[in-house]
Amino acid sequence: MMDINEIREYLPHRYPFLLVDRVVDLDVEGKCIRAYKNVSINEPFFNGHFPAHPIMPGVLIIEAMAQAAGILGFKMLDVKPADGTLYYFVGSDKLRFRQPVLPGDQLILEAKFISCKRQIWKFECQASVDGKPVCSAEIICAERKL
């Protein structure tokens, strides 16, 4: 398990773009992670998406999955951004949205390592709310030394 202070050691993102609140399961040997994002009506994106019917933007759900995958990648390599390594989101495959994410939801983020070739990492990711899938994708990240 990782609290927000440890998460901040493994992700360079900060408010309002840090989209992982807690890691509840991390298995480096099994190459998988489970984390969550508490979605509050106070999120800045709800001011414009959409004021009368607030829905979490899909691109931010994708970003939240990518951040969870990034934590897994850092842990698998046993490095942190402070060590001079970053992961950049470079793409996704097999992306599907299944239902909207609303204020008050707890977004569960799961990522499993698929492969790494020439510092290009691929993860199978899923986001769910109340046990129901809301988004799935293969997330592709590039590992870069600073």
Swiss-Prot record:
The source's superkingdom equals Bacteria
Note the SUPFAM superfamilies from the entry: Thioesterase/thiol ester dehydrase-isomerase (SSF54637)
Q: Which Pfam families match?
A: FabA
List of catalytic residues? 49
What is one cellular component GO term in this UniProt entry?
cytoplasm
- Where does the secretion signal sit in this chain? none
Print the keywords alphabetically.
Answer: Cytoplasm, Lipid A biosynthesis, Lipid biosynthesis, Lipid metabolism, Lyase
**Cystine residue pairs:** none
Q: Output the InterPro entries linked to this UniProt entry.
A: FabA_FabZ (IPR013114), FabZ (IPR010084), HotDog_dom_sf (IPR029069)
Family statement drawn from the similarity comment of this UniProt entry: Belongs to the thioester dehydratase family. FabZ subfamily.
Q: Which PANTHER family match?
A: 3-HYDROXYACYL-[ACYL-CARRIER-PROTEIN] DEHYDRATASE
> What name does the UniProt record give this protein?
3-hydroxyacyl-[acyl-carrier-protein] dehydratase FabZ
> What is the originating organism of this protein?
Pseudomonas fluorescens (strain ATCC BAA-477 / NRRL B-23932 / Pf-5)
